[in-house]
Amino acid sequence: MNIEVLKKEISEVYQTPILHQTAFWSEVKSNLGIKSKAFEFKIRNSDLYTNTGGRSYTVSDFLVLIQQLSKESTIAYVPYGPEIEPSEENQGRFLEELSEIVRSYLPSNCIALRYDLNWQSHWGKDDFCDDEGKWMGPPQPNYQEFHFNYNTINWNFKKANTDILPVNTIFIDIQPDVNTILSKMKAKTRYNIN
């Protein structure tokens, strides 16, 4: 896999509907004391996607937030990026190589690079539903790590104990009146809304 990565100006980040990957978000975070860096990358589509040949490339970018943890350490964080989603069997390898390249642009005291990906969950398939079609939730973290590290060289991906950004989205029909919507919710959910 060959990825070309270039640092770019925050103001040149591509427009996207993903708020956390915009120049605006970088400015918001800057006002909170969090620094940002932007990177553009180019990769051959045959390295990203299975059953893709030819010489076509994908060019995309992503924003990295750098937060001071202590006087001695920082952490780099990529919220909902990178946007492009490789085929499942190429995801770990792609993210590993991208991370290794970006590492040289990060502060020397950076202790981790965290991604909260906006990719389709591996665990949302029918295999993770019970006989009634209800989702059983994700597997144990060690299984998730094993699955994501598949096809990587260093096996360095670790599942975070908590998620920063929402990982599951629920759609609510807002056509009915408020009382009807609330009546369909569990009592604890209603309590947390009110």
Language model segments and positions:
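Short N-terminal secondary-structure initiator segments
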Residues: 1-19, 114, 136-153
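Short amphipathic alpha-helix that is part of the acyltransferase structural core
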Residues: 1-32, 183-194
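A generic short-segment signal for beta-strand/edge and adjacent turn/coil regions
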Residues: 5-11, 35-53, 134-142, 171-175, ...
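Glycine-centered secondary-structure boundary/capping sites
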Residues: 14-15, 23-24, 29-40, 151-156, ...
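A short linear-motif detector with a strong N-terminal bias
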Residues: 17-20, 55-58, 62-63, 91-94, ...
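Intrinsically disordered, low-complexity boundary segments flanking structured domains
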Residues: 25-28, 62-67, 100-102, 152-160, ...
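Conserved donor-binding loop and adjoining core beta-sheet/short helix segment
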Residues: 31-136
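Acyltransferase donor/substrate-recognition loop-hinge adjacent to the catalytic core
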Residues: 141-194
